[in-house]
């Protein structure tokens, strides 16, 4: 659920959102290198979130406000036991038995060639062991933010600017699973009409963490809004910057199309390097089911992943279907 309440001729705003979901997921590790290597451990995740914020206008379209949030993520997982399995296969092969067929045989051959590491097959188990983090993590935040908003429509703008800077604090005394950590996010969106039915949209987003967050609270790349085409959280770290441009064109009555291109970086665990920049591009279809409210179908593409791993040789891609624009 989510909602926005506007009071006193748009001088005060109250926003809230929440969700509770149970879904299968995957964890690749923390840092660019972990995401690029492509070793993923399957998780069964229970997630509950609640967000609330209130802001008041200081002058014109400039607002300041306070925010709060609750995040819970619990993960169930099993080790694959690939290290022991590969060692057993090696012992059998050394004793004169044939290499197994199928996927396991291919992985054994890759291991012998130095292109597969069974010790990295369980990145979530490895992370929990090495970091001491809790797989069932609870986090509560308090925040302050400032924003400037001249958009004509908040959920599907055709002109205007939106800027928001927010600092959140996750104190241990509020029950956080990890010790104190902080988070700063910056959003800059720009919209402009071009020709008949065409809108140019630009988005810049930055997410920086101070301290060590819980495993599910790192800045995550991908998903429904930014860097579309990537599995959300495959690339995660303490610092993230993403940017994208999108052209939106209405073609006939309620029907429209879009195309976008974007790029992003995660770093902190690994050093910032320009050649670690990831890109995203794609196109989509829009159907305006109500005035200025669209159903969105997007197809996003990203980089090719680890060509050594059988499950990771295709280009990163995703179909996305939801209501409202990406930004």
Positions of the model-derived regions?
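Outer-membrane beta-barrel domain signature, especially the mid-to-C-terminal portions
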Residues: 227-231, 272, 276, 310
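Gram-negative/organellar outer-membrane beta-barrel architecture
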Residues: 1-138, 221, 234-237, 294-295, ...
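Short Gly/Pro-enriched loop/turn and capping motifs at secondary-structure junctions
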Residues: 252, 264-268, 290-292, 302-306
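Transmembrane beta-barrel strands of outer-membrane/channel proteins
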Residues: 16-34, 66-72, 82, 161-171, ...
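Repeated loop/turn-to-beta-strand initiation elements of outer-membrane beta-barrel proteins
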Residues: 10-14, 60-64, 153-155, 195-200, ...
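C-terminal outer-membrane beta-barrel translocator/porin domains of Gram-negative envelope proteins
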Residues: 126, 132, 139-147, 151-252, ...
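Residues on the lipid-exposed face of transmembrane beta-strands in outer-membrane beta-barrel proteins
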Residues: 1-5, 50-56, 66-70, 144-148, ...
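C-terminal soluble interaction/assembly domains
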Residues: 275-276, 280, 288
